[in-house]
Amino acid sequence: RYPAYLKKNGTIGFVAPSFGCATEPYKSAFESALAAFHEMGYQTMLGPNCYAAEGIGISNTPQKCAAELQQMYENPENNILLSCGGGELMCEILPYIDWEAIKKAPPK
């Protein structure tokens, strides 16, 4: 299975399954990227952890990061899903993902 191409006026969903964009220079760079996507005609949808700084080196607890990823992946309102930053601690969320639900959802 492959995701559909992102169409003009499509919606890009952003999540923070590891470190997000709560601090500089990541916050400014992310906001510049969001502005560029809007200028190109895309809509954006941000997960609740994109600007969170609740964990140590991770945007929130592994459970909350997994819930964000799960909800955004299953949300039909966004067409593609991107991480807003980080990745080093994403492996901590894996036990909390419902892989059967991910398999059933359209690919992103």
Which sequence ranges carry the predicted segments?
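ATP/NTP phosphate-donor binding region
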Residues: 1-77
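Long, contiguous hydrophobic alpha-helical segments, chiefly transmembrane helices and signal peptides
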Residues: 15, 88-90, 108
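Short linear functional motifs in flexible/disordered or boundary regions
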Residues: 24-26, 81, 93, 105
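Short, glycine/charged-enriched secondary-structure capping and boundary segments
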Residues: 27-29, 95-98
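Long, hydrophobic/aromatic-enriched structural stretches that serve as scaffold segments
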Residues: 66-67, 71-97
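Short, acidic/small-residue loops that bind anionic groups at enzyme active sites
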Residues: 97-108
